Amino acid sequence: MKTNHIITTCLLGLSFGLTACESPMEEIKNIIFDRAFSPIDLEAKNIGESNATLNWTASTGVKNYQIEVYADDSLTFTGKPTFTIKVNHPTVKLENLVYDTKYSARVMALDSADVSRNSKWSEVYFRTSAQQILTSFSLEDVGDRDVVAHWPAGEEVDNITVFNKTTGNKVTQYTLTESDKTNGRAHVTGLQPETDYTLKLYRNGKERGSKSFKTIIDLSGATIVRSTDNFSEMLENATANQVFALYNGTYKISGGSGEDGAGSAVINKDIVIKGIYQTAKPKIQGRFQLENGAGLTLTNVIVDGTKNASNDQFFNYKTATNYKKLDINNCEFYGAVSSGTVMKGFYYINIGATIEAINIQNSFIHDIVCDGGDFFDCRKGYIKSLNINNNVIYNCATERDFIRYDDASNSFGNPIPEINITQNTIDNCMNGANGKRILYVRFNGKKGGQRITVANNLITNTKAVYTNQATTSTPEYRNNYYFNCNNANIFAASDKDNSLYWNGDVSGKNGDNPNYQNPAKGQFTVMNKDISKLKVGAQR
């Protein structure tokens, strides 16, 4: 009972207390703060090379804002602001900024009545975009260990830095010369083959351009040649076994007469001339004169004879001595049919020269009319091995012989030469006169003739025969296909009793039209599926 009385007493006391506090409170209609609220959600958007936009959420009751912008600053706001702006809305476009520059911006909400009640600053940091005045790299600009950068001449720039694109590490820095600045061009070295890089152009530490590139395959030991170089002079000063690696572009051999006349490069040492890119071959205008036993290799180049000052052959041997190989691979050679230089032929040997081998493979040879000479023409020399393999040869030797090889065997100890004509597409050659010879071969070493192989060729649209010479050996014929070969004696056997020495391909005959894809444009893909299955002609 005692406990119940205590609880009852406490409850009654609490009830009286609550009743005493039930007087109504006044309604709060206005709150006055010590200062304006700072802008919130401040951010920089649409940042370009010279502009940016600041946005923020408007502060309640605020009509004006003050903005300060500091250049080359990272939220320290030291020194004098670059510019100050007063606006009455929560967005502002900043203009006339400097490219690739760090900026700090801050915004204050202003109290219209009492500056002491202005808000605290809201701050933001941003960086303007770098410029892009570098032009794109051409194939010619990028080497295996170097690169050439270009930009508009006269721009204010002072250095280039190259970074490894994968790691971001700085690889090399190059200080621009006055000549570089004037010409808008700089050559940077010290790189590695087949590596991804980013090159950046600067002015006072600010980026004015950036381009990425990948260096090409290793050209160790090669002399890199660009179309702006004096290639003729480089050939004149060549050293033994020098390799010239050419970018795409046009290289005119000097020495010709007239404005457009291309001359002849004298090759008197073993050298290699190769194009760097198979799909963008450099074009050489001119010819080659071989002397003093030189060897010459041409790979991935175009040789244009249409501008030559002389219509002499592309390769002319001039001194009587022993020569290294002439190697031609994946090239294109052409002359003019009428307008331009109408070439005499492809090579010419009219001196007592011994040539280790002439190898012509994987190439396009066309429009060498042969005005004044035969196509492959050896009058007084000795070619140990002549190999013509996997080429497309068309519109050549209009009224002349294909291979001429006169008998100078006594001058060389009566050797037996080797001739291999394999896997070629030969179209519209020896088609201007009847009875021209594919093999006008009379070099009769040891009175045993020659070793000749004619295999897997596709021969079309010709009036030629193989030969009519008693000293031409019967070739070994294998799997050759013919179309529109109008002289039946191309297939005829010899009849020595009647002094007829045809030595023709008796296993061959005129077949169906191979239906070349577009011969007028040099496209000799065989569209006739039945013939294509025979694997005859150039396989490209």
Language-model regions: role of each:
Residues 294-305, 323-337, 355-369, 383-398, ...:
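Right-handed parallel beta-helix
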Residues 240, 254-301, 510, 516:
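Beta-solenoid repeat scaffold
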Residues 22-61, 99, 114-155, 193, ...:
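Pro/Thr/Ser/Gly-rich low-complexity, intrinsically disordered linker/stalk tracts
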Residues 259-262, 283-289, 307-320, 339-352, ...:
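Extracellular beta-strand/beta-solenoid scaffold signature
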Residues 94-116, 188-209:
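Beta-strand-rich modules
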Residues 469-540:
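Acidic, glycine- and Ser/Thr-rich low-complexity intrinsically disordered tracts
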Residues 217-258, 528-538:
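Acidic Gly/Asp/Thr-rich repetitive segments characteristic of extracellular carbohydrate-active
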Residues 66-100, 112-113, 161-192:
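Recognizes extended acidic, P/S/T-rich segments that occur
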